[in-house]
Amino acid sequence: MIKRLNNFFEKINIKPQTKNLINYTTYKIGNISKLFLIPKNIQEAENIFKAAIEEKITLFILGGGSNILVNDKEELDFPIIYTGHLNKIEVHDNKIVAECGANFENLCKIALNSSLSGLEFIYGLPGTLGGAVWMNARCFGNEISEILKKITFINDKGKTICKEFKKEDFKYKVSPFQNKNFFILKTELNLKKENKKIIEEKMNKNKQARINKGHYLFPSSGSTFKNNKSFLRPSGQIIEECKLKGLSVGGAEVSKYHGNFIININNATSNDIKSLIEKVKTEVYSKTGLLLEEEVLYIGFKNQKS
C-alpha cells in the first residue's frame, strides 16, 4: 500500500496537505487527514483520478461536506480530494455547464441572474453539483436528474467520457455513479427561461421553509434517513410518530424541529451521532416494524459501508 501511495503521489506531482475535516463537513465533526489534495483545476483532477486508477488507490471525493459522518477517532489513511476549486460555471442560452465543485448557492444565483429556472429546489442547501449528481439530490418534489443533460466523468478504466443521461437512468437517491469507481468532472444542466421575480420568489420560499424547519440552527448532515415510498409517509414523520424528537446521545440530538435531522447540539462525537442513528433505527423498528435506511455516508469507519 505504501509503495502504491508513493507511486501515486509521484505521478500526480501535487504535495498532500494536512487538514482537519472538522472545517470541511457540515456536521463539524472529523479528524486529521495528512493526504488531503486540492486540485486547482479540472486537468489536475483528471491526473489525480487516473493515477489513482492505475495504482489501485481508493480516493474519497469531498465537496460541500454534507450527507457524511467522518470518524473522529482515527486518522484518515486514504487520499481525500477536495473539489472546492473546481467551481467554474458557464451559461449557454438555457443551459448551465458547471464543474463538480460548484456550490448550490453560486449555481442558483447565476441561474437567477440569467433568468433560468430549475434549480430553485436546491437553494439553501450546502452541497456541490458533483455530490448532487452522485446521490441524485432531491427536495420539494424535484430531483437533479430532471434537469441533467450531459455529464463528463472518468470511468474505471481511466477514460474521460461525456455522455447524455435521462431521468430514467436515475432512481430515488440513486445514480449510475454509485458503487462504481467513476469520477464526475462536470455537468450540463438543461433549464428553462423564466421571469426573474418568479424564480427569486421560489428560491426565497424554499429557503424560508428550511429556516422554519431549523435547518441552520445546529450542524447536521442534512436528512439522516432516506424516505421509503412503501412506508407511505416520510421518515421524519415516522420518527415523530414514535415520539423520538429530542432523543439524545452525548452531544447528538434528534432535532425538535425536524425528525429526520440528527444534529450536533453540543460538541458531539462521531460515535454520539452514530449511536443515536442506531438507537432511532432500533426504536422505530421496535414500534412500527419499519427499518429505516441511512442517507448519511460513513467515512473512515472500519468495516462500515460508505
Curated annotation (Swiss-Prot):
Free-text function comment from the UniProt entry: Cell wall formation.
Origin superkingdom: Bacteria
A GO MF label: FAD binding
Database matches in InterPro entries: FAD-bd_PCMH, FAD-bd_PCMH-like_sf, FAD-bd_PCMH_sub1, FAD-bd_PCMH_sub2, MurB, MurB_C, MurB_C_sf, Oxid_FAD_bind_N
Enzyme Commission identifier(s): 1.3.1.98
Ranges of residues in domain FAD-binding PCMH-type: 28-194
Catalytic activity reported: UDP-N-acetyl-alpha-D-muramate + NADP(+) = UDP-N-acetyl-3-O-(1-carboxyvinyl)-alpha-D-glucosamine + NADPH + H(+)
Main subcellular localisation: cytoplasm
Catalytic site positions: 223 (proton donor), 295
Pfam families per UniProt: FAD_binding_4, MurB_C
Record pathway: Cell wall biogenesis; peptidoglycan biosynthesis
Keyword annotations: Cell cycle, Cell division, Cell shape, Cell wall biogenesis/degradation, Cytoplasm, FAD, Flavoprotein, NADP, Oxidoreductase, Peptidoglycan synthesis
Entry's Gene Ontology BP terms: cell division; cell wall organization; peptidoglycan biosynthetic process; regulation of cell shape
Record bears the keyword Transferase: no
Designated name of the protein: UDP-N-acetylenolpyruvoylglucosamine reductase
Subcellular location: Cytoplasm
CC annotations in GO: cytosol
Family of the protein in this entry: Belongs to the MurB family.
Keyword S-adenosyl-L-methionine (UniProt): no
Cofactors, names only: FAD
